[in-house]
């Protein structure tokens, strides 16, 4: 743990490196300046969560971050059970548990760093500032990523506030807004596009996106979910589950067992929005997968690999679709109900299905079941890393 604690010292030095602004300064020297207002939608776990509860058990944490920052690690070490009680949502309502009130941190501080030395949005903020952006022309639309998308509106009116902020920016700046989303933020934004137009949501009509949004910059958006999401809620796996640095991963893994971690992740319905979408049609089956390479012995379509502790030969593999079914068959009823009532992972095959799904909020995160907004002038830019090292097949060990 001491070695991990030393890591932020190097990060602090990196933060002050004058090259941090180099991209923005180069663009500025070429005549590039701020034009459209910018709204940033962070990804999963990257927004800090702070306590606003005043119950006697919460007063010690008042306005301290229980997710993100050093106060999170201190709280976890000092009183693990109390920390768990605060960060987990009510398993049946998906909202705040009794006498607990955690809210997303706001402003640029909400998602610039997860912990000292581990930057998330800070580099983008630095370079936006270098071409003239400031708090009047840029905004971080932080949200409580633990909530299901429907409950983001129920509890925090997140989508209503996002709509109002965009409209205000357009009115003041006389230019349409550019949206930049990361990871889960891409799904949140896709849901928002449906919500804002629908009569049961923002009721702004189909033309709203075209009238208010210049472009959407989708940075590593998990539009079809992510392979990491399933092992997280199934077994509490964290090694490549979330955007955490080595310190946070080591700290959480050291103080929380796998079962505890799985319980926590299941009690954060927002994380389950990133379960793989499209089933075997997208992710492959036992025989082949889109990302298989020539001569590969085992297809990446075999997503989960179960091995018996007592026999190296006894094993069975599961595709993504089978893995999702296994998850729902082996988890608690409250979790099954939450998943089925919040998200859809299927595929629509006809225009009639797609049109009908516009009236079903459960489908709004799924680009395989719903359409893009009716915005012919909207520009969409997608940024992804290519060929990063990864482990496509997850192994779960069992004695049964």
Report each predicted region and the residues it spans.
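C-terminal subdomain of alpha/beta-hydrolase-fold enzymes, centered on the catalytic histidine
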Residues: 306-400
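A generic structural signal for short, non-catalytic loop/turn and secondary-structure boundary residues
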Residues: 34, 267, 373-376
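N-terminal non-catalytic accessory region
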Residues: 1-180, 184-258, 262-265, 272-300, ...
């Amino acid at each position: 743990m001491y070695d991990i604690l030393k890591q932020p010292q190097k990060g602090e030095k990196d933060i002050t490196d004058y090259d941090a602004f180099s991209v923005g300064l180069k663009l500025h020297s070429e005549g590039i300046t701020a034009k459209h207002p910018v709204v940033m939608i962070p990804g999963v776990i990257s927004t800090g969560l702070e306590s606003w509860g005043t119950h006697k058990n919460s007063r010690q944490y008042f306005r301290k971050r229980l997710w993100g920052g050093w106060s999170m690690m201190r709280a976890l070490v000092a009183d693990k059970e109390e920390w768990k009680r605060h960060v987990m949502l009510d398993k049946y309502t998906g909202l705040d548990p009794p006498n607990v009130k955690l809210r997303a941190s706001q402003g640029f501080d909400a998602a610039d760093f997860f912990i000292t030395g581990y930057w998330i949005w800070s580099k983008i903020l630095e370079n936006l500032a270098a071409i003239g952006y400031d708090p009047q022309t840029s905004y971080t639309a932080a949200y409580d990523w633990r909530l299901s998308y429907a409950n983001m509106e129920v509890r925090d009116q997140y989508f209503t506030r996002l709509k109002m902020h965009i409209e205000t920016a357009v009115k003041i700046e006389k230019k349409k807004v550019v949206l930049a989303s990361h990871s889960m933020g891409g799904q949140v934004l896709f849901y928002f596009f449906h919500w804002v137009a629908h009569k049961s949501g923002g009721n702004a009509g189909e033309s709203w996106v075209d009238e208010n949004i210049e472009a959407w910059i989708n940075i590593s958006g998990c539009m079809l979910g992510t392979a990491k999401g399933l092992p997280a809620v199934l077994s509490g796996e964290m090694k490549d589950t979330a955007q955490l640095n080595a310190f946070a991963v080591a700290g959480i893994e050291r103080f929380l067992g796998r079962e505890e971690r799985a319980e926590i992740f299941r009690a954060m319905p927002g994380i389950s929005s990133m379960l793989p979408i499209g089933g075997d049609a997208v992710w492959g089956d036992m025989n082949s997968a889109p990302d298989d390479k020539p001569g590969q012995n085992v297809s990446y379509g075999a997503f989960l690999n179960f091995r018996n502790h007592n026999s190296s030969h006894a094993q069975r593999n599961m595709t993504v679709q089978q893995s999702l079914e296994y998850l729902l068959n082996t988890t608690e009823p409250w979790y099954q109900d939450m998943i089925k009532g919040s998200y859809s992972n299927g595929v629509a095959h006809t225009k009639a299905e797609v049109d009908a799904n516009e009236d079903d909020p459960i489908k709004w995160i799924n680009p395989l079941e719903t359409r893009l907004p009716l915005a012919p002038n909207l520009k969409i830019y997608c940024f992804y890393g290519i060929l990063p090292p990864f482990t496509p097949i997850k192994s779960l060990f069992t004695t049964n």
